[in-house]
Amino acid sequence: TPDTAYFTLDGMFKQQLYETATNLTVNHIINYNYHSEWKIPIAPEAYRRDLKLFGDQYSNFNAGKILLYLEGFAGLDYSIPDDNLTIIPSFPDEWDWMELRLPIKNSWTRIRYNHDEVVVENSPLRVIKKQRID
């Protein structure tokens, strides 16, 4: 089920099993959340036995996957009281880059990832970049 997959993958990221968690998350997104006709990830409520979409397709019932992008691939952890934004990137090897724009406090923070660096612009928080340890 989507919830079981999310909790399993999230647990792997939290236990710093980055390579395995990243590869399995990509696999799950491709096989469960990617719509080949629309060419985008989707978050359906469920699938029918014939693999047609079932239920609510508009409220992103299964949108917990966004945390796998933000906390998993992007490696984001933040604390407003401590004024910190910690980044431990683990985005997929198959991707050339990834970019996020996040509302933090009163500004939009831009974070761009590639395999050589992470560039953070306009963060109101102190940025702490860490390397993942596989």
Positions of the model-derived regions?
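Active-site core of glycosidic bond-cleaving carbohydrate-active enzymes
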Residues: 1-66, 72-77
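Carbohydrate-active enzyme catalytic cores, enriched for enzymes
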Residues: 15, 47-134
